[in-house]
């Protein structure tokens, strides 16, 4: 019946200024809100509070903070994670950051193999390199090329429940899993 947006920007309090608007189109109902006065390049945690009971993260978020699993991600893989406000909320929270710079592609100089000549290696990053880090994976590309591999199919890299899974239990399709490194390293 009602949904509030709660987060760092309103001290995780129910506030009528953060009551989401409800719009219906044919048989489709959408909830939306405009949040003002956010600082550019600052990360804010937030959740949706549904009917005053259920706290959920935005399923379309590009980053989540997971109070149960992020503590097991080594700092060498994901340095300086945003702190989870245990005293304010529970469950997974979404992260929003306005004013982010667009990703600047570093390599545009590559050739894709003909689809009839593909030799694909399906890979779970976590199991392929010991430290489960994308940078280490990049260092092993010569090894794969020497085997004749010309394409890599990564097993799911988006967030999923826990850190030790093949990723077939996805939960946030647009949020790369922090267990493999920061999004700037992808």
Predicted regions located by residue number:
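Short, flexible loop/turn elements at secondary-structure junctions
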Residues: 9, 24, 37-39, 124-129, ...
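Aromatic-rich carbohydrate-binding modules that target alpha-glucans
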Residues: 1-43, 51-74
């Amino acid at each position: 019946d009602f949904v509030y947006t709660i987060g760092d920007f309103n001290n995780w309090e129910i506030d009528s200024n953060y009551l989401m608007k409800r719009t219906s189109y044919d048989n489709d109902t959408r909830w939306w809100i405009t949040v003002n006065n956010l600082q550019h390049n600052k990360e804010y945690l937030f959740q949706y509070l549904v009917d005053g009971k259920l706290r959920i993260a935005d399923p379309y978020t590009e980053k989540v903070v997971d109070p149960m699993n992020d503590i097991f991600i080594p700092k060498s893989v994901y340095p300086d994670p945003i702190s989870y406000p245990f005293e304010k909320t529970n469950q997974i929270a979404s992260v929003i950051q306005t004013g982010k710079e667009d990703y600047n592609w570093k390599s545009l100089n590559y050739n894709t193999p003909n689809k009839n000549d593909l030799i694909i290696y399906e890979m779970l990053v976590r199991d392929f390199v010991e430290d489960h880090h994308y940078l280490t994976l990049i260092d092993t590309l010569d090894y794969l090329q020497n085997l004749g591999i010309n394409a890599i199919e990564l097993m799911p890299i988006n967030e999923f429940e826990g850190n030790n899974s093949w990723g077939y239990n996805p939960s946030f399709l647009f949020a790369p899993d922090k267990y493999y490194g920061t999004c700037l390293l992808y």
